[in-house]
Amino acid sequence: MIIEGPVIKFGDKIDTDIIIPARYLKYTDPQYLAQHAMEPLDPEFYKKASKGVIIVAGKVFGMGSSREQAAIALKAAGVKAVVAESFARIFYRNAINNGLPVITLPNSTKEIDENSYVKIDVETGEILVGNKVLKGKGITGMALEILQAGGIMEYLKKMQTVNRN
């Protein structure tokens, strides 16, 4: 699974209240949530992300309260993947379950510049930036299968169909 696109960069400790503020949690429409993704840091994020971007961030991306809407909002906004030094565990699972690839890369914010164009091999974790290859932690096994299906619901539907035959 290869993903590529331009980079939008954020720092450390981007919590779920920043990814999607609590006042929008009563809404369920992914496109509505997308319009408010990252709003506290960048009110124009939705417009920038709409063409398809890769977020590069620092430590503990997705920390804070558990909210599935954070991954939903990012994906619906046009985020193709998130590369970070580390992720909050619950955000990591929510991202996979919603079909949003998340790659752990040491020193991600030092290695990749804003507006760089990156190409990511999700399975191996290799990230091509210009002529430099960085080695992140790839996604394998069932998590990769869930991503390839487009998320946990699509994966379960696929498994149900396979089991019927």
UniProtKB/Swiss-Prot annotation:
UniProt catalytic activity: (2R,3S)-3-isopropylmalate = (2S)-2-isopropylmalate
EC code(s) of this entry: 4.2.1.33
Domain of life: Archaea
Single GO MF descriptor: 3-isopropylmalate dehydratase activity
Gene3D superfamilies reported in the protein's UniProt record: Aconitase, domain 4
Keywords: Amino-acid biosynthesis, Branched-chain amino acid biosynthesis, Leucine biosynthesis, Lyase
Alphabetical list of SUPFAM superfamilies matching this protein: LeuD/IlvD-like
InterPro entries to which the protein is assigned, alphabetical: Aconitase/3IPM_dehydase_swvl, AconitaseA/IPMdHydase_ssu_swvl, IPMI_Swivel, LeuD, LeuD_type2/HacB/DmdB
Pathway given in the UniProt record: Amino-acid biosynthesis; L-leucine biosynthesis; L-leucine from 3-methyl-2-oxobutanoate: step 2/4
GO biological process: L-leucine biosynthetic process
Cited NCBIfam families: LEUD_arch
Function comment: Catalyzes the isomerization between 2-isopropylmalate and 3-isopropylmalate, via the formation of 2-isopropylmaleate.
PANTHER family, alphabetized: 3-ISOPROPYLMALATE DEHYDRATASE SMALL SUBUNIT 1 (PTHR43345:SF2), 3-ISOPROPYLMALATE DEHYDRATASE SMALL SUBUNIT 2-RELATED-RELATED (PTHR43345)
Assigned protein family: Belongs to the LeuD family. LeuD type 2 subfamily.
Assembly and interaction partners: Heterodimer of LeuC and LeuD.
Protein name: 3-isopropylmalate dehydratase small subunit
Organism annotation: Saccharolobus islandicus (strain M.14.25 / Kamchatka #1) (Sulfolobus islandicus)
Encoding gene per record: leuD
